[in-house]
Amino acid sequence: MQYSFTEKKRIRKSFAKRPIVHQVPFLLATQLESFSTFLQADVPATQRKPEGLQAAFTSVFPIVSHNGFARLEFVSYALSSPAFNIKECQQRGLTYCSALRAKVRLVILDKESPNKPVVKEVKEQEVYMGEIPLMTPTGSFVINGTERVIVSQLHRSPGVFFEHDKGKTHSSGKLLFSARIIPYRGSWLDFEFDPKDILYFRVDRRRKMPVTILLKAIGLTPEQILANFFVFDNFTLMDEGAQLEFVPERLRGEVARFDITDRDGKVIVQKDKRINAKHIRDLEAAKTKFISVPEDYLLGRVLAKNVVDGDTGEVIASANDEVTESVLEKLREAGIKDIQTLYTNDLDQGPYISSTLRVDETTDRTAARIAIYRMMRPGEPPTEEAVEALFNRLFYSEEAYDLSKVGRMKFNRRVGRDEIVGPMTLQDDDILATIKILVELRNGKGEVDDIDHLGNRRVRCVGELAENQFRAGLVRVERAVKERLGQAESENLMPHDLINSKPISSAIREFFGSSQLSQFMDQTNPLSEITHKRRVSALGPGGLTRERAGFEVRDVHPTHYGRVCPIETPEGPNIGLINSLALYAHLNEYGFLETPYRKVVDSKVTDQIDYLSAIEEGRYMIAQANAAIDENGQLIDELVSSREAGETMMVTPDRIQYMDVAPSQIVSVAASLIPFLEHDDANRALMGSNMQRQAVPCLRPEKPVVGTGIERTCAVDSGTTVQAFRGGVVDYVDAGRIVIRVNDDEAVAGEVGVDIYNLIKYTRSNQNTNINQRPIVKMGDKVSRGDVLADGASTDLGELALGQNMLIAFMPWNGYNFEDSILISEKVVADDRYTSIHIEELNVVARDTKLGPEEITRDISNLAEVQLGRLDESGIVYIGAEVEAGDVLVGKVTPKGETQLTPEEKLLRAIFGEKASDVKDTSLRVPSGMSGTVIDVQVFTREGIQRDKRAQQIIDDELKRYRLDLNDQLRIVEGDAFQRLARMLVGKVANGGPKKLAKGTKIDQAYLEDLDHYHWFDIRLADDEAAAQLEAIKNSIEEKRHQFDLAFEEKRKKLTQGDELPPGVLKMVKVYLAVKRRLQPGDKMAGRHGNKGVVSKIVPIEDMPYMADGRPADVVLNPLGVPSRMNVGQVLEVHLGWAAKGLGWRIGEMLQRQAKIEELRVFLTKIYNESGRQEDLESFTDEEILELAKNLREGVPFATPVFDGATEEEMGKMLDLAFPDDIAQQLDMNPSKNQVRLYDGRTGEQFERRVTLGYMHYLKLHHLVDDKMHARSTGPYSLVTQQPLGGKAQFGGQRFGEMEVWALEAYGASYVLQEMLTVKSDDVTGRTKVYENLVKGDHVIDAGMPESFNVLVKEIRSLGIDIDLDRN
């Protein structure tokens, strides 16, 4: 079994019963694959597939001028490499993007040759098409310096859908069926029945019209319409009555209106009897071909075809006319015998299209098209061209209508065609097929579609969303180009004169900057990043809105199984509209979610894994992942629990066709991190999933002792850790960088065989949490590709570590844990267990004002030297300074306009010559309520403005760091080259060389060591081939040096060029403050099971409940928080955590008494291999076993995968192993060893009964009391009402609301109430009066008129009612 570099150091013992058959796919694959498909940057231009940018270009180009004599063709596109890297973009507030250039060809045709087109001239040119933001390797975008994520959208797939209104529209509760054809782009076409069973259509939700208008408009006559939707009854008229051609099926269930006889006149069905199956068999046996029917049987039937007099050509009756006596008379007169009528009945063949045709007043195709034109463009006069153009543009034009590949596939599947490809526009037979199915549905045949089925909803990823925006921009460009193409020849224009890239740039910028789906990345911890990128939203442009979404859309659907997580979704108005992808879910080429299954053949599980979409899944019988199988993969049980078409049932093994790949298949990443998820209530699991994303990274991350085994995947895929790009040996490591000498077999010729990893140190995340990477390798370590070299925020040895393992006791403690409050020991705070670092960014800009430029300087009048003490000569704070609220960080002065001086001031000015008061101090100060340490300063200066010393120093430091990297690379490259050289030179014969090397001497190692390396090249060798090799190595070293010098120059040029700043800004300074936040009462904390609470008190360590050996608990939780919430998982986690820590203590004790390695091996084997998944400890050397044991002292980490976790029996075994009887007796444990006798810390008395005690992974959430606590002294007031503003951001007051007023009224506290409603709120004169009175020492309140009363009076006056206040 292969262990990675970090896995060896600390193996997580897994309780999984099932082997891993399918690895969890890369968690950010959807985002990265989608965007790389969009760009196709690494694909040669000629081999690009028609998707993404290529598809957008080819769909708009070629653009042809109005006269047709000039056209602009698209050849290919190319993306340049970005000007700044990701880190530089974040610092400078730029977008990480690449310039898109398209090669286009302008073709001008000869106007003189009218017959066939002759090309007159061709101009080809590369044209700039705007900037395209690039995705970072972790799946986010850097837009204006901030990281953003484009969330995937779950929208209704294009295609055709049939539904009914569930009887809600009409009072009778009748089901009204409707169909809707939804294209990817273009007009929607709806068909719907009304309560009278007439079929209407509407375009884009406009006014409805009878559907036969549309059928006539596509060129069908009434006869053809009827022939398409009905079968006919054939009658032959006799002198008396008529004969009906006998079709047995059509008579079943009808009541005979006359005696039905066979050919011999024998009565088979008597009058008024219902015709049943036996009657029909008798008629068939009698070989009846025709049935004689009386004349009145014909009356009221509907003619299927026009009846024309053969002699005169006169139309006697039209199709869809009713047969009346007068019609029959005319027919007999004309001698017409055979007529056809529509066959309808009340059960399964309604006369809907016939009734619709009767309502329709249009006569022919033209009239129908005019009617449609009038509906679409009311009030415009219909000319023939306009009418034709509009109708063709609606559904038949490729520019305006696109069903898309998906839409065509879904359409063809739904209407029952075999092929899934076809034209992207709507065809006549598509419209007919849709109406036919809709009529069949109304007739009671077939099923309506389930709109929430994941086969009818597809995911639009970044690439597709960006492509749509880009295409929209291109279409705007196309319009402009069309206009100008006409003048292209006469004005001798080049392609770049025709194309203006502004519309494309603005469309892209708007999408990435302000679209509803482009969101500020949630960067609180690695899990929140991953979850954000795997989120699927039903909101956004082209999706649902919160208000319109009902319960059905938000609900969990059977097809979500393995595709979308049923647990993780926000609470509140977005519940069910924003979802998370399940762990193994994957998108297919059409954008439908698929999930993997193992193929089962003849009740034997094979290794074949198939990805099935929701549509395909419905056809198979699928067993769950926990079905029992023997070692050969044979299903054992007589009945297996399985699913088919959304229903769960027990079936025999031979019927099973597929099986789930893993028990965790149905949940998302966040939910799969919750141990014992199977024992938690779904609502609490939902809260647990959401709260893990709010966990603040702690100063020292600690792995969870009870995990689920997915922590490593999560940490590595999030990109917070540093992974080895290639294997090799660690050559150098410090806190900020790791240098790796790459293995020879992985080094590529022509590339540097050195990998340098610069770690991220104390950087601010989007949520102001701290991102910091710490190396976990030592010099000389051998690492392989993909191994973790450095831990990031919230990771510990390459595993996700969101919180800390706390010793938890479930017991009440003096009411301090009432209502989910949390009691915490002072030791937790003293040990900095939950201390987190938050980084605040404070900006100041110096602008060019009308009165002159603002200046960043240390020279500020009216400021004491104490306040300027922390600023350097440029007026910018030193790094490392500890600052409090109100301290100056950057000194800045702004010119202010000359004010009119009083004569006294003029006199003072004349005497003291004080000129400094024409500037005002606008320095950057630390905001109220904040204090911390300055950890970084960035200075940006506009081009052409002299840099100050501080800015120059920052640039020099950056260059020094870069030079260090280059020197390391060169050192290793040269070292390798000289090693190769030494191997080659030793033993060769020389023709001469430095230090008087004689001709014919053999070179030995000692001679080489004595020489300076660079003098080796002066040795002249006798062997020509070797001499050539020597020359080649010398050249390659010189070439590398030259490359490094060029790279350094380029870096210097980039750093010394002026910064791009917003207009009017001369200089910008960013100061970063690190704020340490310790745990304090009021902070929100939570476990992983939705068990959240607020810290109520931090108790001295000596007062906490303690065990018999004197160890106190860290946290005391209320036991009443468990039963009603039904999240029992937390109790099991505490038991297993107790065992994990106990085992760690036993290993620690062995190490302390320096037990033999063999004893350690035996104990570790007992832990790892007596239950659950087996670990290969045999392959470990003694050193590795020792290192493993050292890392296990703080607890043996357990993995209990979701739905496949540790059983009670296994937990019992682990507890027995951790606490042998002597320890259990000492601690006075219960027999099952999960409850311990505790003693009261204040009295020393033992508690009445034993307490459940153990370790739980507990998190500190991002809702910190420091961010919410706030007090107002004097602050801003609202403009109109003159009441204080509200909220911390506005430095507002606390609202004294309606209910608080009632409370004071109830106590009769009238003066307090008057004070609250006047001088403490909006009595403007009273407010100032109070201050005056206090100054005079006269403590009286003069309450006046509240301003809001004046506002009310004004409002009433605006209604025309005059109110005057009688002041007496």
From Swiss-Prot:
Gene3D superfamilies recorded: 2.40.50.100, 2.40.50.150, 3.90.1100.10, DNA-directed RNA polymerase, beta subunit, external 1 domain, DNA-directed RNA polymerase, subunit 2, domain 6, RNA polymerase alpha subunit dimerisation domain, RNA polymerase Rpb2, domain 2
Organism encoding this protein: Burkholderia vietnamiensis (strain G4 / LMG 22486)
Lineage of the organism: Bacteria, Pseudomonadati, Pseudomonadota, Betaproteobacteria, Burkholderiales
Gene designation: rpoB
The reaction(s) this protein catalyses: RNA(n) + a ribonucleoside 5'-triphosphate = RNA(n+1) + diphosphate
Pfam families assigned: RNA_pol_Rpb2_1 (PF04563), RNA_pol_Rpb2_2 (PF04561), RNA_pol_Rpb2_3 (PF04565), RNA_pol_Rpb2_45 (PF10385), RNA_pol_Rpb2_6 (PF00562), RNA_pol_Rpb2_7 (PF04560)
Stored InterPro entries: DNA-dir_RNA_pol_bsu_ext_1_sf, DNA-dir_RNA_pol_bsu_external_1, DNA-dir_RNA_pol_su2, DNA-dir_RNAP_su2_dom, DNA-dir_RNAP_su2_hyb_sf, RNA_pol_bsu_bac, RNA_pol_bsu_CS, RNA_pol_bsu_protrusion
Cross-referenced CDD domains: RNA_pol_B_RPB2
Keywords, ordered alphabetically: DNA-directed RNA polymerase, Nucleotidyltransferase, Transcription, Transferase
Signal sequence interval, chain numbering: none
Molecular function GO terms recorded: DNA binding; DNA-directed RNA polymerase activity; ribonucleoside binding
Protein task: DNA-dependent RNA polymerase catalyzes the transcription of DNA into RNA using the four ribonucleoside triphosphates as substrates.
Enzyme class: transferase
Any GO CC annotation of this UniProt entry: DNA-directed RNA polymerase complex
Name of the protein: DNA-directed RNA polymerase subunit beta
Organism superkingdom: Bacteria
A Gene Ontology biological process term: DNA-templated transcription
EC number per UniProt: 2.7.7.6
Sequence similarity: Belongs to the RNA polymerase beta chain family.
Assembly and interaction partners: The RNAP catalytic core consists of 2 alpha, 1 beta, 1 beta' and 1 omega subunit. When a sigma factor is associated with the core the holoenzyme is formed, which can initiate transcription.
PROSITE patterns (alphabetical): RNA_POL_BETA
